[in-house]
Amino acid sequence: MHLSIILNPRADVLHAENAAEMAALYRRLLTDAARAGERELMLSAAAADGIPPAQAAHVTLHAIVETLRTLPPLAVTLRCPDEKTLCAHTADWNMFYQEEKPE
């Protein structure tokens, strides 16, 4: 599994109504890409009204990581439209998914 999180101010933001819809959106995008034989996929960070950026980042990364574990190898780049979104996703990745934790 390969996941990169980058800053891309021109990235669109995916919108969802709630956390469950956000997770389902990422699962569907990843599964569809794998079925189509894709090896690389660029995704945009998602936002939902009323969900703080840290929670949105956690929902996003959990959905991506758990789905990637069930699929053939797929390199994913997650594009964040601003520093706040990038920081939320990077912090969540470092806390929950990074294999080597900083000291």
Language-model features, listed with the residues they occupy:
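Phosphate/ribose-phosphate-bearing ligand recognition and processing surfaces
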Residues: 18-103
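N-terminal beta-strand/alpha-helix entry module and adjacent surface
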Residues: 1-20
